[in-house]
């Protein structure tokens, strides 16, 4: 089967361009209606303690890429800070609540803002997708756009040939509405390339809304800091930079 070359100019490219532009527009609309990023809803002290825990985890996982002196300096600094709890956010005691008690999330003013931003994010994702799906179904229904260059099993036929009633058609042929669904699920690398955040543009963001960094509960942060400091203390450092000159010379000479 041969396809008209004009299909890629009048069907394939318009759908792809509209999908990319809609994603960019949705990103700016999300920024406008939510007012700021998700991190700004978190107190600065909470972000600081979370970042120090992340820093310690990264040092444990990637310390082999550092020299022994650099690792020892970073290890000493982090162990001292985590042990002394310099960056621990002190919870405010309200209404006679005891220290270490898990706070009620419904009393947190940031919770209502997060739920409202979640609802706004769902609307900002649902409305454009509905409009574009109607546009594709109305103007490009029944078009076969391309043939995939790799073989597929028959289970992909229903997904790739939506709107095409032809039982004998090869499963590699893709219809217009199926190309729309593929674009919805597969445009995150394109958004990353043009500088947009894939967490905000992905399908997960349309369901759950943007989320800030999630650290341990307030009552367990101090325990997590001491545990991380203990892990840093007992870790055995092995750097990949030892004898690197001899290994390079041995490989290329």
From Swiss-Prot:
Domain of life: Eukaryota
One example of a Gene Ontology biological process annotation: protein folding in endoplasmic reticulum
Entry's Gene Ontology cellular component terms: EMC complex
Intracellular or extracellular location(s): Endoplasmic reticulum membrane
Signal peptide: none
Major place of residence: endoplasmic reticulum
Residue spans crossing the bilayer: 10-30, 126-146, 176-196
Key words of the record: Endoplasmic reticulum, Membrane, Transmembrane, Transmembrane helix
Membrane association type: Multi-pass membrane protein
Disulphide bonds in the chain: none
A Pfam family assignment: EMC3_TMCO1
InterPro entries: EMC3 (IPR008568), EMC3/TMCO1 (IPR002809)
Job of this protein: The EMC seems to be required for efficient folding of proteins in the endoplasmic reticulum (ER).
Record note on quaternary structure: Component of the ER membrane protein complex (EMC), which is composed of EMC1, EMC2, EMC3, EMC4, EMC5 and EMC6.
Homology family: Belongs to the EMC3 family.
Alphabetical list of PANTHER family matching this protein: ER MEMBRANE PROTEIN COMPLEX SUBUNIT 3
Protein name: ER membrane protein complex subunit 3
Originating organism: Saccharomyces cerevisiae (strain RM11-1a)
């Amino acid at each position: 089967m041969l396809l008209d070359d004009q299909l890629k100019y009048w069907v394939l490219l318009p759908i792809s361009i509209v999908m990319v532009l809609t994603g960019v527009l949705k990103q700016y609309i999300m920024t406008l209606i939510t007012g700021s990023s998700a991190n700004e809803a978190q107190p600065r002290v909470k972000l600081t303690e979370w970042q120090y825990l992340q820093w310690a985890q990264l040092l444990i996982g990637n310390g082999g890429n550092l020299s022994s002196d650099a690792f020892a300096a970073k290890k000493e600094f982090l162990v001292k800070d985590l042990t002394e709890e310099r960056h621990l956010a002190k919870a405010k005691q309200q209404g006679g609540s005891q220290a270490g008690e898990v706070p009620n999330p419904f009393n947190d003013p940031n919770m209502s803002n997060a739920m409202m931003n979640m609802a706004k994010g769902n609307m900002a994702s649902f409305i454009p997708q509905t409009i574009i799906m109607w546009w594709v179904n109305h103007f490009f229904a029944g078009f076969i756009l391309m043939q995939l260059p790799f073989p597929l099993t028959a289970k992909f036929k229903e997904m790739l040939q939506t709107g095409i009633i032809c039982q004998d058609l090869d499963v590699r042929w893709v219809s217009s509405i199926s190309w729309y669904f593929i674009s919805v699920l597969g445009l995150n690398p394109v958004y990353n390339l043009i500088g947009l955040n894939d967490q905000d543009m992905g399908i997960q963001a349309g369901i759950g809304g943007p989320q800030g960094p999630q650290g341990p509960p307030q009552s367990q942060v101090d325990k997590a800091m001491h545990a991380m400091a203990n892990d840093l203390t007992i870790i055995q450092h092995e750097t990949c930079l030892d004898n690197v000159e001899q290994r390079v010379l041995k490989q290329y000479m």
